[in-house]
Design a protein with these regions (language model features):
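Nucleotide-activated donor-binding/catalytic signature segment of Leloir-type glycosyltransferases, i.e.
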Residues: 282, 289-319, 324
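Acidic donor-binding loop of glycosyltransferase active sites
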Residues: 303, 319-338, 352
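Conserved acidic donor-binding segment of nucleotide-sugar-dependent glycosyltransferases
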Residues: 368-369, 373-380, 389-395
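Donor nucleotide-sugar binding/catalytic pocket of nucleotide-sugar-dependent glycosyltransferases
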Residues: 35, 57, 176, 191-238, ...
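Membrane-proximal helix-turn-helix segments that form the acceptor-binding/catalytic region
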Residues: 21, 122-137, 152, 160, ...
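C-terminal alpha-helical cap of glycosyltransferases
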Residues: 389, 413-450
Length: 450
């Protein structure tokens, strides 16, 4: 059985897409996923065996010196200061040049620890080095990098060898157009690094066309559909009881990261105009505190609830409790505009109608399958109007819910994963590429030249 090493820049515990890919590949390959440890969560293990052919290795997040500093800053500084004083005095006695050298090293080290931006770069570099060390030693036949932040690791492990290995770049986002990133800088980096990959996958055809426009080739597509399952067979969780809601209260659900550009502030504002139901957020993220403050200030505060992040294996049990689901991404970058949104397919799989944005990939599914209402996601009143339509018209809600039962047979991972198998099978038949700076191996449909 051939070996696959995959990299992902997270803890993996809530990454449903990577879990689906690794699990599917483990049916044909020996899969090793290299992720990042979380020192704040004791339940996350440094090594985990998901199944016989799928194992997870998590590298340490922080170098030892950073860990000691974070554990007890005062004790760390006193200890380091005392040791440094003794060493400096010794060096001064023998050689003042050595003392100056030591002082310079200490100043640079202090800057790495105390200056947040430098500390972050130092930590990230240490993670990259650990990932490379772990991945290189596995000596796999195929390396698979999820997103741009693990592509350098994949390149080093696959190409810096006497006998180069094959490398797949699996880009889940539009790396050159995301919030919080320098688009010009990222574009230059990505354009350079993709010269070294043997094949590339993106989430959908909208993004593949965009990739062709900026980089000159059309990669393969692998949609982020949910696994096909019978929602009735999932464990039952009484979310109404958990939230102290009456059994007939309609849950208006948002599940996913509490991040910028997802229209979450507008959902809270829209509750002023939604006549019935309780808005429930499931997830965590950078906006969590802000959203809770907004909810507390809202006249509808009693109708807005928060639930912490739920493990992806348990999430369907929560999703099924919803009357409708929100997916109202904001058009703040091309990454959002072009998204297919895995949350949309999670709603579909649980037979939950949606109120969604009108972006191409999302609207095509919602309108085409008639599973919900499409709105201008920047317009609070349109969001509220659509929610009220579904809340008041239970027959329409049931119709959309029934349509979800049919749509799930079309948009599911059991069908989509065959494209992943095809990509790997085609890659196996080709010789590994040596480092070369050319796009000539890619054709219009994403296939590769022999």
């Amino acid at each position: 059985m051939k070996k696959v090493t995959m990299f992902v820049w997270n803890h993996f515990t809530n990454d449903a897409r990577v879990n689906r890919e690794c699990t599917a590949l483990s049916e044909r390959y020996d899969v090793n996923l290299i992720a990042i440890d979380d020192p704040k969560d004791d339940s996350i293990k440094s090594f985990e065996e998901i199944n016989e052919n799928f194992k997870v290795t998590r590298v340490k997040r922080y170098p030892m010196i950073i860990s000691c500093y974070q554990h007890d800053k005062t004790k760390f500084l006193i200890t380091v200061g005392s040791v440094t004083t003794v060493i400096a005095a010794t060096f001064l006695y023998y050689n003042w040049i050595l003392m100056i050298y030591l002082a310079s090293v200490l100043l640079m080290s202090a800057a790495l620890i105390k200056v947040r931006s430098l500390r972050k770069r130092f930590v990230n570099l240490a993670i990259i080095v650990r990932m490379i060390k772990a991945g290189y030693s596995q000596n796999s036949d195929i390396y698979h990098s999820n997103d741009l932040n693990t592509l350098p690791q994949g390149i080093v492990c696959s190409k810096l060898r006497l006998k180069p290995r094959k490398l797949i770049y699996d880009s889940h986002e539009v790396q050159s157009s995301r919030t919080g990133y320098n688009p010009k800088k990222i574009k230059r980096i990505e354009k350079f690094l993709i010269n070294f990959v043997d094949d590339m996958m993106v989430e959908n055809h909208t993004r593949a066309a965009h990739n062709e426009e900026i980089y000159g080739f059309y990669p393969k597509t692998l949609y982020n559909y949910s696994e096909l399952y019978d929602i009735e067979k999932k464990p039952v969780i009484n979310l109404h009881q958990q939230l102290n809601l009456s059994a007939d209260e309609k849950i208006l659900l948002y599940q996913g990261g509490l991040q910028e550009g997802r229209g979450l502030e507008l959902l809270i504002e829209a509750m002023d105009y939604i006549d019935e139901g309780t808005l429930v957020f499931i997830g965590g993220g950078k906006l969590e505190r802000t959203l809770k403050n907004l909810a507390e200030e809202s006249p509808q505060r009693d109708r807005i609830k928060f639930i912490p992040k739920v493990h992806f294996k348990m999430l369907p049990s929560y999703t099924r409790e919803a009357y409708l689901g929100f997916q109202v991404l904001q058009n703040i970058c091309y990454n959002h505009y072009s998204a297919s949104s895995n949350k949309l397919f999670e709603y579909i799989m649980a037979h939950v109608p949606v109120v969604s944005c009108n972006f191409p990939e999302v609207a095509q599914v919602v309108n085409g399958e008639q599973i919900g209402l499409v709105v201008d996601s920047h317009n609070v009143h349109q969001i509220a109007k659509a929610a009220n339509t579904l809340v008041k018209d239970e027959n329409l809600q049931r119709k959309f819910s029934e349509n979800c039962r049919q749509a799930k047979l079309k948009y599911n991972w059991e069908i989509e994963k065959t494209k992943l198998y095809d990509t790997y099978s085609q890659l196996e038949q080709k010789k590994s590429k040596h480092i070369e700076l050319t796009f000539s191996r890619f054709t219009k449909d994403g296939e590769t030249h022999a």
